[in-house]
Amino acid sequence: SKSNVIPSVFPIGYDGLAFIVNKNNNDTCFTVNDLKRILTGKATKWSDVVPGSKRGDIEVVFDNTRSATTNFVVDSVLHGEKFGENIMAAKTSKQVIDYVDQNPGSIGVIGSNWLNDRRDSTNTTFKKNIHVVSVSIKDKATPMNSWKPYQAYLLDGRYPFVRTLYAIVVDPHK
């Protein structure tokens, strides 16, 4: 009977939670705490996280309200805390990238698998029309202690926002 079938679960890969900004925005190093403050609405202006910034309001855009990316942020990054008022949703990850490309004050949140330039078979080149944010677990983010969601940094633990991807397999003959 089907009720006696027990699925097997296997980790098959990793995906990073990536933060992206407009290509004209050079503010690309943030701490985990900076990003949490942005996501919860405690930091709503660029000057709240980048002293002296004149960029204005921060708009945060996700792929959609019920996506795995959104759920991961609520559960694993914000630990159940509510999103701020500056959060909005597109319908797809491509729309997030397009929105960030067209809106200089925005931050997009997508899976890192959407970032790679498909023309680069080594997967070490990110899309040219956006900047990928580097994230630090330290109290102050610098280029030396902040990491982009490259596969190597997802695997070795330097990049802090990593999701494990699983395959669930059911063998009806077991």
What is the predicted function of each stretch?
Residues 1-174:
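Exported/periplasmic ABC-transporter solute-binding proteins
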